[in-house]
């Protein structure tokens, strides 16, 4: 590779210099072909300019021959050096010629009038090739015209004139002052490395990535929520989560199944006077009481208890069988009654009013649990508890067994001491998040999230409701950044935050792998469309799903292109050829082009604006983010 680099720089310089020197005196040979004095003079003039024009042509040919190379910028610098050497030789030759008779120039006449026009023409050709070489050296392969249809705008745009948002409009819409990092302000498809696939371990494929200004969202328009769609291995964490965690200045809640974000941003956010809390089943010493917010700041205890029970029970946005729905609803009511008994009956100490205690009360043999329910009905101080328990006091054993099995199954993760400690601890309270000085990183790995989604739902739901119940009386805004959010299943509180979160200081940014994941979670096409209508911005990157690619293509719109059509006809008398131009409709970007986009490129949609095609802010390409991000910290240093 080093030899190739040296060759690309040295070869054009050597070829151009040898051409200029080797073709010296060619004007004498050319002039012999003339039959008259005027012809011989003209050929002699051409011969003087010919070496320089030939050298310029060599530079251009060399650049076009190198087009598509990953290191074409080196060829550009080499051709530029060769052009400079050619102009220097022309200047020295002309200067020595003029110096020979400079003393004989008549008074009042400039020596510039004696400049050789043929030499000037040759030097100008070298200058033009040098300018093109400089362009190639600066922008690489983007200096060459792309083979694409000519787009028509204005009155002739019969089929539409959809176009990409320009970078100036993007800078106004997503200013650098925002806290949620969207991407980088440059067109990847017009970069010098656009023809090559992005490789994280090969800086030569990065192009302008990492050096361009950031595009950031400040929550100033729309609902303030964002959705990111990126396929598996699509740099979701490195391009969205980590950059935002480094730049966001308010309260932050991150669901991070990769467990990579907190170690990277820990020191940076700590230096910004943030209190960092990391909820990790591997380190259960850090936890909070998921019931400590119940009944506070305007919400009734009964409503809040029902909300907690709904997070524990898995739900679906789609249709369910009647039998399944009955047992689930009954189990939900039983769980609500047991949580209410712990919080409202008055026989449980304040420090024991936790989900761990709820599970302990539930995880009893059926006969003993039925006795407990009878005792709760007889002795509880809360009418709400009695009314919810009443249905189970005289329930038939067969039906109660089905209800009991559902309730035990949905709460079995509370039997794990490390899981229960996360939502039954006392390290911090939900008030700390609402105060705006605390960040929470939920480090639940993908396997745990898949099998015990209720754990993450309870944590996220508690934080959301703790802020929601304050009716906007929070410091700044709290950003909930949820990776692999499809694993949580259906959560009604997320829909509430989607529709009314802006008023209460809640911002959501959710990451899915495809549109199909969202539709599966929320029950079909119509339910998922509500999220598209409510989101301030939607990003698509590293798409591998044809359905998602088709959606992107349709949403970008149609454009009008001009097509050259050539028809040939052959007859006995000869052949004829007819050439015509016609207008045709073409998507701004076709589905197969979406699937072939580089991994560091994305398309961002916002309401009322043209689609934005830009780069992604992959943190390890940016020196400013590498200076802020650190190496993973030790497991013992989790809380500050």
UniProtKB/Swiss-Prot annotation:
Keywords: Cell membrane, Conjugation, Membrane, Plasmid, Transmembrane, Transmembrane helix. It comes from the Bacteria. The chain crosses the membrane at residues 6-26, 46-66, 70-90, 120-140, 215-235. Disulfide bonds: none annotated. Gene3D superfamilies: P-loop containing nucleotide triphosphate hydrolases. It is a multi-pass membrane protein. It is found in: Cell membrane. Pfam families: T4SS-DNA_transf. One of its GO terms (cellular component) is plasma membrane. Its main location: membrane. InterPro entries: P-loop_NTPase, T4SS-coupling_protein, Ti-typ_conjug_TS_TraG-like, TraG/VirD4. PANTHER family: CONJUGATIVE TRANSFER: DNA TRANSPORT. Belongs to the VirD4/TraG family. This is Probable conjugal transfer protein TraG. It comes from Sinorhizobium fredii (strain NBRC 101917 / NGR234).
């Amino acid at each position: 590779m080093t030899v190739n680099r040296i060759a690309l720089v040295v070869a054009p310089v050597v070829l151009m210099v040898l051409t200029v020197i080797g073709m010296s005196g060619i004007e004498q040979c050319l002039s012999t072909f003339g039959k008259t004095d005027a012809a011989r003079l003209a050929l002699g003039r051409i011969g003087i300019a010919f070496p320089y024009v030939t050298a310029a042509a060599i530079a251009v040919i060399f650049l076009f021959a190198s087009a598509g190379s990953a290191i074409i910028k080196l060829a550009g610098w080499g051709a530029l050096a060769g052009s400079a050497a050619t102009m220097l030789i022309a200047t020295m030759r002309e200067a020595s010629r003029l110096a020979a008779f400079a003393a004989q120039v008549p008074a009042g006449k400039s020596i510039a009038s004696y400049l050789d026009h043929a030499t000037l023409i040759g030097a100008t050709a070298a200058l033009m090739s040098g300018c093109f070489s400089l362009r190639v050296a600066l922008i690489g392969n983007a200096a060459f015209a792309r083979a694409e249809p000519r787009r028509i705008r204005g009155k002739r745009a019969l089929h539409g004139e959809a176009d990409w948002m320009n970078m100036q409009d993007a800078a106004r819409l997503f200013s650098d002052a925002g806290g949620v990092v969207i991407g980088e302000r440059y067109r990847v498809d017009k970069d010098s490395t656009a023809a090559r696939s992005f490789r994280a371990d090969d800086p030569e494929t990065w192009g302008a990535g990492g050096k361009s200004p950031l595009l950031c969202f400040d929550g100033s328009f729309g609902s303030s929520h964002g959705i990111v769609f990126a396929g598996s291995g699509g740099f979701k964490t490195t391009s969205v989560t980590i950059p935002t965690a480094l730049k966001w200045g308010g309260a932050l809640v991150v669901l991070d199944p990769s467990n990579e974000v907190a170690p990277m941003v820990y020191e940076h956010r700590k230096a910004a006077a943030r209190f960092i809390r990391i909820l990790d089943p591997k380190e259960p010493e850090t936890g909070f009481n998921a019931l400590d917010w119940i009944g506070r700041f305007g919400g009734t205890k009964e409503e809040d208890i029902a909300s907690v029970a709904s997070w524990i029970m898995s739900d679906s946005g789609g249709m369910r069988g009647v039998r399944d729905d009955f047992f689930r609803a009954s189990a939900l009511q039983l769980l609500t009654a047991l949580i209410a008994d712990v919080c409202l009956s008055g026989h449980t100490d304040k420090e024991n009013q936790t989900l761990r205690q709820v599970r302990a009360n539930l995880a009893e043999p059926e006969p003993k649990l039925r006795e407990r329910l009878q005792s709760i009905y007889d002795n509880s101080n809360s009418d709400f508890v009695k009314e919810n328990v009443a249905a189970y006091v005289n329930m038939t054993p067969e039906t109660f067994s089905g209800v009991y099995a559902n309730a035990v199954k949905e709460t079995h993760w509370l039997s794990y001491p490390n899981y229960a400690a996360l939502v039954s601890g006392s390290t911090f309270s939900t008030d700390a998040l609402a105060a705006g000085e605390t960040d929470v990183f939920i480090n639940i790995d993908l396997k745990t999230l898949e099998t015990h989604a209720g754990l993450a739902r309870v944590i996220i739901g508690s934080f959301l409701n703790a802020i929601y119940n304050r009716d906007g009386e929070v410091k700044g805004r709290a950003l909930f950044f949820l990776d692999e959010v499809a694993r949580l299943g259906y959560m009604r509180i997320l829909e509430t935050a989607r529709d009314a979160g802006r008023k209460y200081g809640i911002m959501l940014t959710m990451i899915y792998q495809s549109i199909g994941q969202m539709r599966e979670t929320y029950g079909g096409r119509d339910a998922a469309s509500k999220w598209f209508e409510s989101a301030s911005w939607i990003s698509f990157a590293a798409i591998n799903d044809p359905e998602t690619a088709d959606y992107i293509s349709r949403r970008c719109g149609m454009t009008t292109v001009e097509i050259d059509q050539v028809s040939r006809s052959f007859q006995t008398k000869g052949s004829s050829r007819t050439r015509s131009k016609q207008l045709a409709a073409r998507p701004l970007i076709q589905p197969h082009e979406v699937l072939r986009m580089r991994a560091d490129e994305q398309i961002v949609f916002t309401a009322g604006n043209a689609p934005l095609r830009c780069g992604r802010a992959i943190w390890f390409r940016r020196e400013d983010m590498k200076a802020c991000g650190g190496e993973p910290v030790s497991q013992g240093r989790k809380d500050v």
